[in-house]
From Swiss-Prot:
This is Retroelement silencing factor 1. One of its GO terms (molecular function) is histone binding. Plays a role in the regulation of imprinted gene expression, regulates repressive epigenetic modifications associated with SETDB1. Required for the recruitment or accumulation of SETDB1 to the endogenous retroviruses (ERVs) and maintenance of repressive chromatin configuration, contributing to a subset of the SETDB1-dependent ERV silencing in embryonic stem cells. Residues 261-272, 842-856, 1073-1087 have a biased composition (Polar residues). GO terms for cellular component: nucleus. It is found in: Nucleus. It comes from Homo sapiens. It holds the Pfam family DUF4617.
Length: 1747
């Protein structure tokens, strides 16, 4: 079982042993438990048990055991280890093995190339199919489960195959021989490789990017991933089938891990590619692959009719071996051969024809020479031939596009049929649920149903979604290929199908059970016929009559064969047969519903692993495949049969859900299936589910919540008590099971580890997200689904979320799916990547849990799911922590994968983080009593409801409970940031969607929320803390909180890395989405404590991680910083914490934690303010850590908050006007509102408008008052700038509103006005310091503090900011004057004008769009407008020069940059445009100054800006989210640049910029965050907590660049010039993720920061070489670079320390006069160093990512 444990397929293998010991154990245990499986799996030939152990690949031996081929077993041990249940496969493999399977394998490898798909390791792949014969037979019902483990990996492979088809094809060739050679060794190594490869893919972004590259390869499929689930699912269905094959290949890979890992993926890919584009390649390949499907069936038949098959297997084996001996003949006669075999064995003919087909396929695969059906030859050869494989891929893509179109037509037809069925009555809600999802999820439903019927990816719940779909698509494509291969393979396949339908019309589904020989034959056929024919039915609703006839024949066969759902299955299938398209709808609905039930069972199976899995393989194979087909067409006919057949919906679901719930309850595979299906189903099903939970609550409750929910209205208590406890375990357990299934990678150790990550790349995180949300959320499902839809509409995970958007349209249709937490988990999980993902999570959980509420088992179920399921799902609950973390990890991994597809990926990433906060809050609440689950999800639902103003009154209190519970919990247990993240996300969505509505709702429920929230918080508080702590791992930030926890560690590592890589994409997504949550995500990166502010998408991960690492560690390390950070927090808090202050009394812990957490994070970068607030926040999150000065801030902010609240009339307007401006403000204020005010859902908006109102109010009111206006500008400008950056949509409105008022001079104002605000606010209130840590300030203050700390001015600034104010005023004015009016007047005016011009332009993204010359023109245009404003800002900032601490730092940097720009305008210009784009809002002052310094370089900077705008487009969100950090980074970069003096070309400069950003940002931010006293501690902190601190910051940075990991490779070239912050983020991400550069950078940064303190230029120069190497180089380069670094540092230190250090020191103190010479020196030295480094880099890193 070692292999199982390693790939963590052990969970699935236990699943399979559970349900189908003979078959699933054969396939799974063969696959997973090699020796154990042999004796267990194949009772038919126990002799092979010995052989099986003797057989290095016991996988094939059980089949051989069944086949009684001990001799061949040993011969085909290796292959037959893979050919677990494949007589044919065993024969072939035996033959191949006997005949030299390695030879054949290599022949297949080389000759087959792509025929690897066609069974390049025809023996191996037959074994895989043989294994998948059992697996596919079980994958026909639970075959998905078996393939799910391997198929998940295969899905990874498959996904990889999409993008890496060419890659994987060679890998297949390479790994095929290895697989064949080292079956045993590879067996374990395969699991390792699978896991590693999966992780590889995940880390490489292959998980989803590979899946996303298929959009490139199969553009329609991934793009259709959501909308065209059918094709993508078809792609995945072929994947699943192939993955089922690959599962057996994985079994082979168990035997042949290296080959199987790559080869199976490649085979899978090729085969899937063939099957995916069945028409061109599948014609030939389909000959192979349908035959492979036949091999599936044949092997399944072999496995399932072990003894009677044994003889036939022997005969067929002999004949096939003969045919193998004559592969060319077989290849030419594959169709005939299959027909021959089919004719030879009528029942067995299917085994034999299938085997013949399999053998023929293998023959074809091996001998592609003649005609691998014309396409098969190229295909198999193309597996190795990359060019041919590419051509094949092109063909396949075209075929898939055709399939997509056909599926779209089918979806339309099915939708129409569903609508008709919905009109018919029972299907109304279900059909509504599926009508839209049918189009979007129709294919996925079909494919999922087919996946479950054919491949039955039941166990892999996450994988099921994608992987089942691939299997179904594979089947569909195989079926289509069969249809396309009508002359060849469809004759065979259709003959096979016809014979299967005629000969085994019942066995087709009978085979879904480990039944008699025909049953096994049919099972094999069903895995193929179900997969293929169901796919035919799905693929061809047009062909649905024929296919449905086949499926109908299969339906009766299922009825016959399936013992439990047999009669009902017959009825259902008869009903479905009556409705062929309805059958397809039923397939879709069943796919969704049965998959929900099967996923429940699969979850249970995963939870109950082996018994349930095996049970579910018989049950969910019978009942799983039948419930997949039947329960997928029966409960899913309850769902879709609700659509398809009311009778079938009721009786079918009752019978299916009765038969199935017993099995569903007994095995979670149905849940897993259902969850996977739900994943692939549209998340709008949440709304549909809500309605169906209301409407079909008795019927559909089980359908949605527990897949057999119609029967389980009581069964939702039983199936939702069992299945819904399991569905709550589908929420918790399905969360855990989904988590387990999806994340059992880490937790349960299922093979789905890889496939899930890859396949459910988008879905899986969402599933986890939603499952997390689902567990607690059932209170207000009705309202949320609608809100969920906007989320769906916002941005889909690739096509998935587009599908979800369509599903949002098909709210009613999706309501059935929404009924099930599995579906809602899967569905809303999919949706949750969107900003409303949390809403959707709420909605999904609400729907899912509304059904439990209807079932009245929601909380009981939650508790039983959380507690009772903890028995089965105690691991699942841990899985939920670790698995949810896994979920997050998967999410992030998936998102990381998606990150490559940044565009379609971004929105979802943002919303994954949105849902992650909710996840964090919701899982917290699942731990909490029902109150909290209701309260926590309900508030978010209320946010949605508030948006809708639906159940506002009902949810008014609960949102309060939930909100403040979440806040309080968040405050105490870091639940607050996640919840606030969720709320911010929800609020962002809500603000975006229904700002005024939410404002009204906010105002309505503010008092109630405040009161009941405070009360409930305290009630739920401890539990929520526990839930928060328990659930923390689920959130990336929570992961960081629990990063020290063992379960979380692995996931946390992945999540941390992924978050580092992933949030980047989130930012880009958010910016593009223009959603508040995304903007808040930006601020989370910027204001690491602003995570509450920006807790939208990134907060949960960024904010929590940052807070944990920053606040907690700073608590530990910098407790002293509490006061000072608090003072700084006060600066920012006049605006931000004013709303907090009101709520602070109620949420004192929350308010300091929330308000100051963000501010103190800002101040943490600036000062140690983050520690005060973060300390308070951490105190609240973790323990009663003193609130630092949050109470003072609260007191002072209470007044302002009250004032702002008094401005509530303006709130709505300002929320409307300034909400976009206030997106950042909302981020800033909203978290505080969320954290502080129990009226978070409303108050978040209330305070958001209030803050904005305050700032807007102050803008007209105190516009002439420098502080109010400055503060106002700080709030508006910072947030405006950031929001403008973040939300182009909102920015345009906001731009006009605020950019002219406060926006981009607000960046300089933020530097100037910010400082003014800081001064005045400090003078007025000590709260003003909170204003300083405003998001923009976060970047500036840390840098400025570091800078000032480095400079004499900054030394007193950090410790005492009041002193610093005065000193900063005088000193900075001095310095401004010293630096010349260039900085104070010229630079300020000039660059401020430029900055405002840029800001206005950049805010409107004119700068991004016309950054180059138009940007300059726009800047000239804006000069008048922004000049006036900048004059005001300058007046304010001149008035309060003291507050120039941030600005002084910026100016200092600008001055240095001006000098360095003068020295090297190119580099500086590039920095400036990057700043304009990346840090445009927050770095605008820096930008403006540097731009003002060099207008010339603006043109070159324009190019860079264009580049960085290109990067911004892809990284725009990433870049924009990190305005503060970008400001930090940019300031650091500027300092570095100034120190470098522009010597370094852009590349090196960018490398330096990246590393300097990293080091400067992390160091400066960290050091800035600490007072000078703490700086030494900070150094210790860096050393001690450097990793975590960097993680914390890296998480911010990670959020900057989680997506850009690849982006920072691909776009690093751009970004090094274009996006300094993304570069920085990439650098830090690289440090954290890619190269583990964080520790090096942090340590280096510590030194650099120390030097920088003393000598700004030197540390930066020093850092620049350090970072240049580090960023550009990999770990090696860092290792190699140590010497180079030392050299360069020595040179830099010798030169720059003497020149730049002294001159820059004097420049820091005296002005930029001294800076120019050092800059020149540093420029020269840096040029020298650049050349040196470039040479070194070219040597060490010929392909450096930076270049």
């Amino acid at each position: 079982m070692n292999w199982n444990e390693k790939p963590k397929s052990a969970t699935l293998p236990p699943l399979y042993p559970k349900s189908q010991p003979p078959f699933l154990h054969q396939s799974l245990i063969n696959q997973i438990t090699t020796t154990s499986q042999s004796s267990f799996s194949y009772p038919g030939s126990n002799q092979e048990a010995c052989m099986y152990p003797g057989n290095s690949n016991p996988i094939s031996q059980p089949l051989l055991n069944i086949q009684n081929y001990p001799q061949q077993i040993s011969v085909s041990d290796m292959h037959n280890g893979t050919v677990v249940a494949s007589h044919t496969s065993v024969e072939r493999i035996t033959y191949a093995n006997v005949n030299g399977p390695k030879q054949l394998t290599h022949n297949l490898q080389m000759s087959s190339g792509v025929t690897q798909n066609v069974w390049l390791n025809s023996p191996m792949r037959n074994p895989v199919h043989s294994h998948i014969g059992a697996t596919v037979s079980h994958q026909t019902d639970f075959g998905a489960n078996v393939p799910n483990m391997p198929a998940l990996q295969s899905q990874l492979i498959t996904s990889d195959t999409y993008s890496m088809q060419m890659q994987m094809i060679p890998s297949n060739s390479t790994r095929l021989p290895v697989a064949y050679q080292g079956n045993q060794g590879l067996n374990q190594s395969f699991s390792e490789q699978q896991v590693d490869w999966t992780q590889q893919c995940i880390s490489k972004g292959l998980t989803y990017p590979d899946y996303r590259p298929p959009p490139k390869l199969y553009r329609y499929s991934p793009q259709s991933f959501l909308p065209d689930s059918t094709i993508q699912k078809q792609n995945f269905i072929p994947h699943t089938s192939l993955q089922v094959k690959n599962s057996q290949l994985l079994n082979s890979v168990l035997t042949l891990p290296s080959r199987q890992t790559s080869a199976v993926p490649s085979q899978q890919y090729a085969t899937q590619t063939d099957k995916r584009p069945p028409p061109p390649p599948y014609n030939c390949r389909y000959g192979s692959q349908p035959l492979q499907s036949t091999q599936h069936i044949t092997k399944h038949l072999s496995m399932e009719v072990p003894q009677s098959r044994e003889m036939l297997s022997s005969e067929i084996r002999t004949s096939f071996q003969q045919q193998w001996q004559n592969p060319n003949e077989n290849v030419s006669t594959i169709g005939n051969f299959t027909n021959l075999k089919v004719n030879t064995n009528s029942k067995q003919p299917f085994n034999s024809p299938i085997r013949s087909s399999v053998d023929g396929v293998q023959t074809l695969a091996q001998t592609n020479e003649e005609k691998i059906m014309d396409s098969c030859n190229p295909t198999s050869n193309q597996v190795l031939d990359t060019s041919v494989a590419k051509e094949k891929l092109v063909r396949d893509i075209k075929t898939l596009v055709e399939i997509k179109q056909k599926f779209s037509e089918l979806a339309r037809k099915i939708k129409i049929n569903k609508d008709l069925l919905m009109a018919a009555g029972c299907i109304k809600m279900t059909n509504t649920s599926y009508s839209e999802p049918a189009q979007n999820s129709k294919l996925s439903l079909k494919q999922t149903a087919k996946i479950q019927s054919g491949p039955q990816i039941t166990p892999v719940m996450p994988e099921n979604a994608e992987r089942q779909t691939p299997t179904v698509v594979e089947s569909a494509e195989t079926n289509k290929t069969q249809c396309m291969l009508n002359s060849d393979i469809q004759e065979v396949n259709c003959r096979r199908f016809n014979q299967v339908d005629s000969v085994l019309p019942n066995p087709v589904y009978s085979e879904k059970r480990p039944m008699p020989d025909s049953s096994h034959d049919v099972k094999v056929l069903t895995s193929k016929t179900s997969a293929v024919e169901m796919t035919q039915a799905v693929l061809n609703t047009q062909l649905s009559s024929e296919n449905v006839t086949k499926v109908e024949q299969n339906s009766p066969a299922v009825c016959e064969t399936i013992s439990v759902p047999k009669s009902m299955s017959t009825e259902e299938y008869k009903s479905k047969i009556q409705n062929e398209n309805m059958l397809l709808l039923a397939l879709l609905s069943q796919a969704r519903k049965t998959q929900k039930t099967v996923l429940k069972d699969a979850n249970q199976t995963i939870q109950d692993s082996k018994p349930d899995s095996c049970e579910m393989n018989p049950n969910t194979q019978m009942t799983g495949n039948q419930l997949n087909l039947k329960n997928m067409e029966t409960p899913s006919t309850s769902n879709v049969s609700g659509r398809v057949l009311d009778n079938s919906f009721c009786s079918g679901q009752e019978s299916s859900t009765k038969g199935m719930p017993a099995k569903s309850d007994s095995s979670c595979s149905m849940e897993v299936l259902a969850t996977c299906l739900s994943l692939w189903k549209k998340q709008p099903s949440d709304t549909a589910k809500e309605k169906e939970c209301d409407k079909l609550r008795t019927n559909t409750t089980a359908v949605g919540i527990s897949k057999p929910a119609n029967i389980h209205v009581k069964s939702p208590c039983s199936v939702v008590g069992n299945s819904n406890s399991q569905n709550k375990i589908s929420n918790p357990s399905q969360q855990t099971a989904l988590s387990m299934v999806m994340h059992n990678y880490e937790s349960s150790g299922i093979n789905i580890t890889k496939g899930t990550e890859l396949q459910i790349a988008v879905v899986s995180p969402l599933v986890l997200s939603e499952v997390k949300t689902l567990s607690v959320k059932g209170i207000t499902p009705a309202v949320l689904p609608e809100t969920v839809y906007p989320v769906i509409k916002e941005g889909s995970v690739c096509s998935l979320q587009n599908q979800l958007a369509e599903n949002a349209k098909a709210t009613a249709a999706l309501k059935v799916d929404v009924s099930g937490p599995v579906a809602s988990t899967a569905t809303s999980t999919k949706i949750f990547p969107l900003t409303q993902k949390e809403k959707q999570n709420e909605s999904t959980n609400g729907n899912s849990e509304v059904t439990p509420n209807v079932n009245q088992g929601k909380h009981n179920k939650l508790e039983s799911a959380i507690h009772s399921p903890m028995n089965d799902q105690q691991i699942s609950q841990e899985s939920r922590n670790s698995t949810v973390v896994s979920s997050d990890t998967l999410q992030i991994d998936n998102i990381c994968s998606l990150v490559e597809g940044d565009t379609s990926y971004n929105s979802q990433i943002a919303k994954i983080f949105s849902s992650l906060p909710l996840k964090m809050v919701e899982p917290q609440k699942p731990s909490l009593p029902n109150q909290q689950g209701i309260g926590s999800r309900e508030p978010e639902k209320q946010l949605d409801n508030t948006t809708e103003n639906k159940d506002f009154g009902f949810q008014k209190d609960k949102p309060v409970q939930c909100t403040d519970v979440s806040h309080k919990i968040c405050d105490q247990s870091k639940s607050e940031p996640p919840l606030e993240s969720s709320f911010n996300n929800l609020e962002t969505n809500r603000v975006i969607l229904e700002k005024s509505s939410l404002e009204h709702a906010t105002e309505k429920s503010t008092a109630n929320d405040t009161c009941s929230s405070a009360a409930i918080q305290e009630d739920i508080y401890p539990q929520e803390i526990d839930a928060s702590s328990n659930y923390t791992p689920q959130d990336p930030a929570r992961n960081e909180i629990h990063s020290d926890k063992a379960p979380v560690l692995y996931l946390h590592d992945q999540l941390s890395e992924l978050l580092k890589e992933f949030p980047y994409g989130i930012e880009a997504v958010n910016t593009r989405e223009g959603s508040v949550g995304q903007q808040t995500t930006y601020q989370t990166s910027e204001d690491q404590t602003a995570d509450k502010t920006s807790s939208d998408s990134k907060d949960p991960a960024d904010q929590i991680q940052i807070t944990i690492l920053s606040s907690e560690q700073m608590k530990e390390i910098f407790p002293e910083q509490d006061d000072q950070p608090y003072v700084v927090d006060k600066l920012a808090e006049p605006q931000k914490e004013e709303p907090i202050t009101e709520v602070v009394s109620q949420c004192d812990l929350q308010a300091p934690a929330a308000g100051q957490s963000r501010d103190s994070v800002i101040l943490d970068s600036e000062k140690d303010d983050i520690h005060c607030c973060a300390l308070g926040w951490l105190s609240m999150v973790y323990e009663g850590v003193p609130q630092c000065q949050c109470n003072s801030i609260k007191n002072s902010s209470s007044e302002e908050e009250k004032q702002k609240e008094q401005c509530s009339p303006l709130d709505t307007n300002s929320c409307k006007q300034g909400e976009r401006t206030s997106d950042r403000d909302v981020t800033v204020v909203q978290f505080k509102s969320l954290v502080n005010n129990p009226k978070t859902p409303p108050d978040g908006k209330s305070h958001f408008p209030e803050l904005q109102d305050d700032s807007r109010k102050d803008t007209p009111k105190t516009k002439h008052k420098s502080l109010p206006r400055t503060e106002q500008e700080l709030v508006a400008g910072q947030f405006s700038s950031k929001c403008d950056k973040l939300n182009p949509l909102q920015n345009h409105k906001r731009k006009k509103l605020r950019f002219h008022e406060v926006t981009f001079h607000s960046s300089n104002k933020m530097t100037a006005s910010y400082e003014q605000a800081s001064q005045e606010t400090r003078q007025k209130k000590h709260v003003t310091q909170n204003s300083r840590p405003l998001k923009t300030k976060t970047a500036f203050l840390p840098n400025k503090d570091v800078y000032k700390k480095h400079s004499s001015l900054g030394q007193s600034l950090s410790p005492e900011k009041i002193k610093l104010k005065l000193k900063s005023v005088s000193f900075k004015q001095k310095r401004k004057l010293d630096q010349g009016n260039v900085l104070d007047m010229e630079v300020k005016k000039k660059k401020h004008d430029k900055q405002e011009q840029k800001g206005s332009v950049g805010a409107t993204f004119k700068l991004g769009d016309s950054l180059s010359n138009p940007n300059e023109r726009a800047i000239v245009k804006e000069k008048m407008v922004s000049n006036t404003k900048s004059v005001d800002t300058k007046a304010s900032s001149s008035k309060f020069s003291r507050i120039l601490t941030p600005k002084e730092y910026l100016q200092r940097q600008k001055h240095k940059e001006a000098l360095s720009n003068k020295a090297s305008k190119k580099i500086c210009v590039k920095n400036v445009p990057c700043d304009s784009e990346h840090m445009r809002p927050s770095k605008l002052a820096v930008q403006v100054e540097s731009c003002g310094k060099s207008n010339e370089k603006h043109s070159s900077g324009v190019q860079t800006s264009k580049e960085s705008l290109n990067g911004l487009t892809s990284h725009g969100k990433n870049l924009k989210i990190h305005h503060s950090q970008e400001s930090k980074t940019y300031n650091i970069l500027r300092n570095v640049k100034e120190k470098v003096g522009g010597k370094q070309p852009d590349k090196i400069w960018i490398d330096k910029t990246k590393l300097d950003k990293l080091t400067n940002i992390s160091n400066e931010a960290q050091f800035s965050q600490m007072p000078p006293q703490v700086k030494d501690q900070k150094k210790l902190y860096l050393n001690r907590v450097g990793f975590k601190c960097t993680e914390r910051e890296s998480i911010s940075l990670t959020k900057l660049e989680s997506s850009p990991r690849k982006l920072h490779k691909d776009k690093r070239q751009e970004n090094k010039h274009k996006t300094f912050l993304p570069v920085k983020g990439n650098t830090e991400k690289s440090n954290m993720l890619e190269f583990k550069l964080c520790p090096d950078i942090l340590l280096k940064n510590t030194n650099s920061v120390e030097e920088r303190k003393d000598v700004k230029p030197h540390p930066r120069k020093e850092q620049a070489p350090l970072q240049v190497s580090g960023i550009k180089s990999t770990k090696e380069d860092w290792l190699k670079f140590v010497a180079t670094k030392k050299r360069t540092q020595k040179d830099s230190q010798e030169r720059d320390n003497v020149n730049s250090r002294l001159s820059k020191r004097s420049f820091s103190a005296d002005g930029f006069e001294m800076l120019q010479n050092p800059v020149k020196d540093s420029k020269e030295m840096f040029q020298t160093y650049k050349q040196m480094y470039l040479e070194k880099r070219s040597r060490s890193l010929g392909s450096s990512p930076v270049k």
